[in-house]
C-alpha cells in the first residue's frame, strides 16, 4: 500500500499547519507560549466581556483544535505535539490571557494527558474562575475486538 502525505516536512508539519491556518484566519494569532487566540476581544451581544472558552489536544488532526478558534466558538486553542496533550504551561498561559474577568471554560476530552494537564493549568491559574466541561463520548474504537478498546471515555 502506498502511503502519501500532504505536508512539507514531518519536522515542520505542525508549525506549517498553524501558519497556514493563521494566514487564512485574520482573527487568529499565534502566541509563542503555545496557543492560538482570537485577536478581537470576546464580547456578549450587549457588548460586555464574555466568558472565554479554551480547548486543546494532540496535533496530527489539523485543523483540530485551532480550527475552532473564532466568533461564537473557542477563544483560544492549545495544540500539543503530535498525538500528545498540550502541556499545563500552554493551557495556563492561554487561560490567563483569555480571561476578561468573566471566567474561562475549559473543554477537555476525557483523555488522561488532557485531563491531567488542564487540571494542573486550572490550579496554576488560580486567580481565574475556571470551569471544566469533560467530553467523554468517543466511540471511534467501539466494537473493534482487535484494537485497544475505547479511549477517552469515562
Model-derived regions: residue spans:
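N-terminal amphipathic/basic leader segments beginning at the initiator methionine
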Residues: 1-53
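Gly/Ser/Thr-rich loops at beta-strand to alpha-helix junctions
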Residues: 58-63, 109-117, 152-154
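Glycine-rich oxoanion-binding loops at beta->alpha junctions
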Residues: 61, 68-101, 138-140
Amino acid at each position: 500500500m502506498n502511503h502519501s502525505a500532504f505536508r512539507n516536512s514531518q519536522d515542520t508539519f505542525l508549525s506549517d499547519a498553524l501558519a497556514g491556518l493563521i494566514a487564512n484566519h485574520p482573527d487568529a494569532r499565534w502566541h509563542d507560549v503555545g496557543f492560538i487566540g482570537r485577536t478581537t476581544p470576546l464580547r456578549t451581544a450587549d457588548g460586555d466581556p464574555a466568558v472565554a472558552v479554551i480547548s486543546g489536544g494532540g496535533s496530527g488532526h489539523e485543523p483540530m483544535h485551532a480550527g475552532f478558534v473564532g466568533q461564537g466558538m473557542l477563544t483560544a486553542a492549545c495544540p500539543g505535539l503530535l498525538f500528545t496533550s498540550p502541556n499545563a504551561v500552554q493551557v495556563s498561559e492561554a487561560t490567563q490571557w483569555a480571561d476578561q474577568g468573566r471566567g474561562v471554560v475549559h473543554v477537555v476530552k476525557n483523555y488522561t494527558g488532557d485531563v491531567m494537564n488542564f487540571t494542573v493549568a486550572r490550579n496554576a491559574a488560580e486567580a481565574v474562575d475556571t470551569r471544566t466541561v469533560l467530553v467523554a463520548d468517543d466511540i471511534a474504537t467501539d466494537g473493534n475486538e482487535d484494537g485497544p478498546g475505547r479511549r477517552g471515555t469515562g
